[in-house]
């Protein structure tokens, strides 16, 4: 399953005509604990980024995405063309991480066999994700926005939220649920279908009926 945290980085790179060298395979749990890795990235976290000249080393996917977005000709569109847009981009990136991604993980991981089912965790995640999607739906409804923070062009926050929802649309946001958030669905398909972005996200995978726990 594609790493949802790096899709936004790869998409920002594609829009900036940048090439990322991603080592394959990467032995998570081993390679990121090696002395060589920890010398560059003391936290041992992944994803991790090193610039081609070795001068920049970063962890945390949002920081890496910010650096990549700022490193090419698409930077003004991706990061905002004025202070107000830049602040709005940052606001919605925080929202995507705090209100969407963590709740998405709570409802998706057990459905793909990466975590044991916990009714409490799943319930809280479902409630949180539903509330977050309702916020985005209301926001998009004002003026029938095409994108979250910028006028007429996608920004880094569109890539970030689409990344956070990638697994959710694949495994949790089923046909019935999509019917309650039509603007969010249209926005998502618009973003992942954008030129160069679709090369990263691929053909949208939308679950018909989500898996439910056996009781």
Swiss-Prot record:
CDD domains: GST_N_EF1Bgamma (cd03044). One of its GO terms (molecular function) is transferase activity. Keywords: Transferase. Residues 1-76 form the GST N-terminal domain. GO terms for biological process: translational elongation. Residues 82-215 form the GST C-terminal domain. It comes from the Eukaryota. SUPFAM superfamilies: GST C-terminal domain-like, Thioredoxin-like. GO terms for cellular component: cytoplasm; nucleus. Its EC number is 2.5.1.-. Belongs to the GST superfamily. PANTHER family: ELONGATION FACTOR 1-GAMMA, ELONGATION FACTOR EEF-1B GAMMA SUBUNIT, PUTATIVE (AFU_ORTHOLOGUE AFUA_1G17120)-RELATED. This is Glutathione S-transferase-like protein.
């Amino acid at each position: 399953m594609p790493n949802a945290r790096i899709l936004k980085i790869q998409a920002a790179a594609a829009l900036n005509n940048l090439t990322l060298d991603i080592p394959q395979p990467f032995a998570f749990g081993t390679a990121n604990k090696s002395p060589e890795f920890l010398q560059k990235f003391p936290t041992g976290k992944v994803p991790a980024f090193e610039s081609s000249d070795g001068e920049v080393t970063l962890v945390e996917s949002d920081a890496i995405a910010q650096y990549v977005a700022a490193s090419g000709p698409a930077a003004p569109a991706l990061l905002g063309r004025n202070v107000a847009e830049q602040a709005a981009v940052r606001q919605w990136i925080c929202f995507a991480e705090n209100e969407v991604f963590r709740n998405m993980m709570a409802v998706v991981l057990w459905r793909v066999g990466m975590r044991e089912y916990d009714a409490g965790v799943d319930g809280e995640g479902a409630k949180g994700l539903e509330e977050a999607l309702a916020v985005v739906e209301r926001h998009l409804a004002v003026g029938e926005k095409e994108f979250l923070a910028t006028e007429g062009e996608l920004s880094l926050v569109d890539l970030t939220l689409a990344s956070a929802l990638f697994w959710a649309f694949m495994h949790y946001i089923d046909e019935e649920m999509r019917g309650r958030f039509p603007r969010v669905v249209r926005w998502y398909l618009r973003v992942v279908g954008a030129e160069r972005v679709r090369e990263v996200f691929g053909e949208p995978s939308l679950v018909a009926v989500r898996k439910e726990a056996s009781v």
